[in-house]
């Protein structure tokens, strides 16, 4: 809704970038807090976090470029991250790869590390989707029950009971009532965050919280894709690539839970 906040020496600073940075910062402090509670080496956790973020950014950009190659015409387009254009699933995969490298290099326990990362990812993603709302990226399909096309957030008696209209200059089509998929996902991520914090307190085995995160987000994203207007469905199956990845995520999380629960030596965490 507010693509640009201020301009410093001609450089325009977007609310999107500020909120994404805030999400990373909040996630960083949450990871450190949980790492101390687990008795982990905080310096090793810090370094692993930085590697995961770097790989996550690279993965998010590469995945978006592969999904939307027609949007990129020059090197500047490829590097202009401040304009948006990242894929969360690409970032998640890249972040996991980076985290595995850090866990291996700094000799951290795998599943304890995964469990402290899961709530931080969900909370950071909440701020990220608020950023998407400000920029207008990741927008929804046209809302068919709209009664106004004035810029702003409008309430409705039809699900999801509100819709958004973006101004000119946003990534989303201007002055068009749309499903508020960014806000729907943002508050879905916030709910997942609180569920994970509760689960973290009472987790039955290491790796449970991370597995639960993959499952919950997989369900959330699969559902939301029906309302998103960004990624077209795959011909022949009617599902988007994000929905296919979501189904794989759900199935993988259930399998992971089963394997971790039934490991006889689960009282001892694993290193990679």
UniProtKB/Swiss-Prot annotation:
Residue ranges of the TM segments: 15-35, 49-69, 86-106, 178-198, 207-227, 239-259
Compartment(s): Cell inner membrane
UniProt key word Cell membrane: yes
EC number(s) stated in the UniProt entry for this protein: 2.5.1.145
GO biological process: lipoprotein biosynthetic process
Main location: membrane
GO cellular-component term (any): plasma membrane
Top enzyme class: transferase
Binding-site list for a 1,2-diacyl-sn-glycero-3-phospho-(1'-sn-glycerol): 129
UniProt cross-references to InterPro entries, sorted A to Z: Lgt (IPR001640)
Membrane topology: Multi-pass membrane protein
GO molecular-function term, one example from the UniProt record: phosphatidylglycerol-prolipoprotein diacylglyceryl transferase activity
Cross-referenced Pfam families: LGT (PF01790)
Pathway: Protein modification; lipoprotein biosynthesis (diacylglyceryl transfer)
Function: Catalyzes the transfer of the diacylglyceryl group from phosphatidylglycerol to the sulfhydryl group of the N-terminal cysteine of a prolipoprotein, the first step in the formation of mature lipoproteins.
Family statement drawn from the similarity comment of this UniProt entry: Belongs to the Lgt family.
Annotated HAMAP family: Lgt
PANTHER family on file: PHOSPHATIDYLGLYCEROL--PROLIPOPROTEIN DIACYLGLYCERYL TRANSFERASE, PROLIPOPROTEIN DIACYLGLYCERYL TRANSFERASE
Protein name: Phosphatidylglycerol--prolipoprotein diacylglyceryl transferase
Species of origin: Aquifex aeolicus (strain VF5)
Gene (name only): lgt
